[in-house]
Amino acid sequence: MNDPVQNSGLVVVDKPAGMTSHDVVSKLRRAFSTRKVGHAGTLDPMATGVLVVGIERGTRFLAHLVATTKAYDATIRLGASTTTDDREGDVVFSADASTLDDEQITTAVTSLTGEIMQKPASVSAIKIDGKRAHERVRDGEVVDIPARPVTVSVFDVLEQRREGGFVDLDVRVHCSSGTYIRSLARDLGAALGVGGHLTALRRTEVGPFTLEDAIPLADLQDNARLSLSLDEALARSYPVLEITEAEGEALSMGKWLEPRGLKGVHAAVTPSGRSIALVEEKGKRLATVFVARPNTL
């Protein structure tokens, strides 16, 4: 019997620079010959690296990846601020950063590590009354997005270069979803009084998916293929709860099971390796959060 979700799953794309996340989706729709393609976590055109894309029923799973952690390698230039907080904007402030010493930089980096309040860039993809902030800015509106809590668990300076009054920092950042790396660059420059902006960004991880999983977009256009099946995606993303085939049938119909003392969301997997659903204990029920294989398929 054919598996109804055999063509569903995730593609971990190594996004090239100069392309929007939606551009990637459009190209993969053609490559996979389906409209059911979507992505989790927007990458700016200048950024490269991990972009997780759902195919067919995998698109419905993407909502359960939104709150995951992410990791980036980036380059921050100290000595100038721009309108967009990255290299593509116009310079609005500059100052000589050559006098900064390592201790000053370390102190400022430390102040932006941990649980912090961060104000997203005005040209972000955040929606304000149904319209993205960057679209409002492009239309001439003044956009002010309130600061919100984010977590920066790792903010390490890997290398430092000094030239022409600028200090370029190669950094590695691990952070919660919703953290803007160019906002970190802006805030680091502000803390040091010299301005700062992002000049390079590469996303290396989205939750459990890394650059090792990523396939260059050009390769996918020549040979469209999943990085992970829907079964593999659920089992990779969440702790596995082994269930019987009968329990799997019940979950596929949206029924609940008896509680097992679980904490958090688990992937319910049958002995044959089929990931049936994401489940979570709610009161006296083990209920479905997302059904990967509904019996209606």
Swiss-Prot record:
Keywords: Isomerase, tRNA processing
MF terms (GO), sorted A to Z: RNA binding; tRNA pseudouridine(55) synthase activity
Protein's name according to its UniProt entry: tRNA pseudouridine synthase B
PANTHER family in alphabetical order: PSEUDOURIDYLATE SYNTHASE TRUB1 (PTHR13767:SF2), TRNA-PSEUDOURIDINE SYNTHASE (PTHR13767)
Catalytic residues as annotated in Swiss-Prot or TrEMBL: D44 (nucleophile)
The encoding gene: truB
EC number: 5.4.99.25
Gene3D superfamilies: Pseudouridine synthase, PUA domain
Catalytic activity: uridine(55) in tRNA = pseudouridine(55) in tRNA
EC class name: isomerase
Any Gene Ontology biological process: mRNA pseudouridine synthesis
Free-text function comment from the UniProt entry: Responsible for synthesis of pseudouridine from uracil-55 in the psi GC loop of transfer RNAs.
InterPro entries recorded: PsdUridine_synth_cat_dom_sf, PsdUridine_synth_N, PUA-like_sf, PUA_sf, tRNA_psdUridine_synth_fam2_C, tRNA_psdUridine_synth_TruB, TruB_C
Keyword Isomerase in annotation: yes
UniProt record similarity statement: Belongs to the pseudouridine synthase TruB family. Type 1 subfamily.
Keyword Hydrolase listed: no
